[in-house]
């Protein structure tokens, strides 16, 4: 490592690399903030031997090479890091066998690139370039890529990155290099990068174009062509020319999605949703290229193009497509907290259409569907006095539970309906059975009566006037949550026991996942909305108390006393309309 004025941050990278190293060699190039003593003291505290050298600054290529030479003979491999790097996860170096090893920078679903950072000792390694240096060797060498659940985060917080003139200094150094060697494609590329980072998009476009025309490394050519399009877009050049630049970039490397995503994004912003949808759908079909190493925005492949496709589909009235994509994005872990809120809100725009579909009478299969021999869920639905609302609730349940063959019995608490309406309901829903209960029975007594008729392991209770709208294997999902969490009494359908669309999801830190569960969270309150209860665990706390003034509060208190918790799915799948 080479350092200069890194006192504010260097201890973090030292802590990160400590578990993996047996010695260290750090070159200070002129720190004036005490970096030298901080490093010596910190490594002594970690109990790792090593040596700090002080050498004058010349340029990145020279000083990196000097550091490599000073580290020679100390270990089997030399790991080059920067003072502001962090190691996220746990890299496994135990299988190192090649002469050089590439490490992943950036999270797997973010902006990712691979860099050679680990080198076998004893080979004639050196760095070239005055800035944006690159490794060279005077003899052939083998490279391997270190895969695994880790990445390095280059935080741009070191002394050099705090210099407001950093990009201008890089530009000036690279201009000298390009003048010295006009065919130095790497210097041309990073000169274009420096202009882009400075916001000088006219010069960035010029130098990216020059780099693209030089040919050579296909990934660098592609990225230069992509940046030509991005520079033209920032310069507000005519869209047909900008689009042509993006499409030429994609045509040069059709395994990359960034250019098509940029085109889709533009059309969506312009309200031209048909075209946006076409380009987004094509971009979303491209998997993350497994072998590319240069500035891969994996998010364009894994979620951002899908996001654009769903927004366009929603605006085109293709709500089933939009709803499905948004739900899949929310079910994953690729979205930032800010994007998760936005995607959840966008998903909810399609809910009115989904409700209209879900509450329609399920004519197909309603008279022929029979429970499986191993059906293990009893569904109970409470009804108010309005037969239309009762039918809408039943329709939404039957349409949304695509695994309804798991229903052993469908019991309808229809005491508040007229006799004529009850007869009509039984005719329209042959699977439904009426609950034999008196009119206007207290809530706790009614729930106790319902629970006493449950003969299955799982009980899904749906209070009156709820509407489901998301087709899925809901019964199986709720049951899997209860199977996965042995200390959970009940699993609610809606996050935060919401009764309306909220656009909210749980923070990633508290989300749980299991096979077939999707995202869910643990809570300590018995849901008042639709909920699946484990009847064995309900029996262990004495069942429903028919005399409780607040039946949900009573169940919550007794569950907590017995060491049981509750859970909810991490989304809203039904709404209350009463």
Give residue ranges: language-model regions.
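"A position-specific structural signal for the A-helix of alpha-solenoid helical repeats
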Residues: 190, 227, 262, 308, ...
């Amino acid at each position: 490592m080479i350092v200069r004025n890194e006192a504010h941050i260097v201890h973090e990278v030292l802590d990160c690399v400590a578990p993996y190293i047996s010695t260290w060699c750090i070159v200070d190039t002129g720190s004036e903030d005490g970096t030298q003593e901080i490093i010596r003291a910190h490594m002594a505290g970690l109990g790792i031997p090593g040596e700090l050298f002080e050498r004058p600054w010349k340029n990145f290529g020279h000083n990196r090479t000097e550091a490599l030479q000073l580290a020679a003979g100390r270990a089997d491999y030399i790991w080059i890091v920067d003072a502001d790097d962090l190691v996220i996860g746990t890299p496994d170096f135990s299988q190192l066998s090649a002469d050089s090893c590439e490490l992943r920078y950036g999270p797997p679903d973010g902006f990712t690139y691979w860099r050679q950072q680990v080198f076998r000792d004893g080979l004639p390694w050196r760095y070239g370039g005055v800035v944006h240096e690159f490794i060279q060797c005077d003899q052939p060498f083998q490279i391997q890529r270190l895969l695994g659940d880790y990445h390095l985060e280059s935080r741009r917080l070191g002394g050099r990155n705090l210099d407001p003139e950093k990009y201008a200094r890089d530009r000036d150094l690279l201009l000298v290099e390009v003048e010295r060697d006009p065919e130095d494609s790497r210097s041309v590329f990073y000169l274009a990068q420096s202009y882009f980072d400075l916001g000088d998009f006219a010069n960035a476009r010029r130098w990216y174009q020059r780099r693209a025309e030089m040919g050579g490394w296909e990934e660098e050519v592609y990225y230069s062509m992509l940046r030509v399009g991005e520079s033209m877009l920032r310069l507000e050049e005519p869209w047909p020319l900008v689009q042509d630049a993006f499409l030429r970039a994609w045509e040069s490397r059709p395994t990359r999605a960034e250019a098509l995503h940029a085109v889709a994004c533009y059309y969506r912003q312009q309200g031209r949703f048909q075209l946006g949808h076409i380009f987004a759908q094509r971009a979303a079909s491209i998997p993350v290229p497994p072998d590319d190493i240069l500035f891969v925005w994996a998010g364009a492949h894994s979620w951002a193009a899908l996001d654009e496709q769903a927004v366009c589909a929603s605006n085109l009235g293709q709500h089933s497509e939009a709803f499905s994509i948004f739900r899949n994005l929310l079910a994953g872990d690729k979205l930032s907290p800010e994007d998760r809120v936005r995607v959840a809100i966008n998903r909810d725009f399609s809910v009115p259409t989904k409700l209209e579909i879900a509450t329609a009478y399920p004519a197909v299969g309603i008279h022929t569907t029979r429970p499986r021999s191993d059906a293990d869920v009893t569904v109970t639905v409470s009804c108010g006095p309005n037969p239309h609302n009762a039918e809408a609730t039943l329709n939404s349940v039957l349409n949304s539970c695509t695994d309804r063959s798991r229903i052993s019995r469908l019991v309808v608490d229809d005491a508040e309906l007229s006799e004529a309406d009850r007869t009509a309901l039984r005719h329209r829903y042959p699977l439904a059975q009426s609950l034999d209960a008196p009119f206007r029975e207290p809530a706790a007594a009614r729930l106790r009566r319902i629970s006493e008729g449950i003969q299955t392991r799982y009980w899904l209770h749906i209070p009156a006037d709820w509407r489901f709208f998301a087709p899925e294997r809901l019964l199986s999902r709720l049951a899997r949550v209860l199977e996965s969490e042995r200390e959970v009494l009940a699993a609610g359908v809606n996050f935060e026991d919401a009764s309306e669309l909220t656009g909210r999801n749980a923070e990633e830190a508290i989300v749980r996942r299991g096979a077939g569960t999707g995202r869910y969270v643990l809570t300590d309150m018995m849901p008042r909305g639709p909920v699946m209860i484990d009847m064995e665990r309900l029996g262990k706390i004495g069942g429903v108390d028919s005399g409780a003034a607040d039946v949900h509060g009573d169940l919550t208190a007794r569950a907590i006393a017995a060491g049981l918790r509750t859970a909810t799915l991490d989304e809203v799948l039904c709404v209350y309309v009463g």
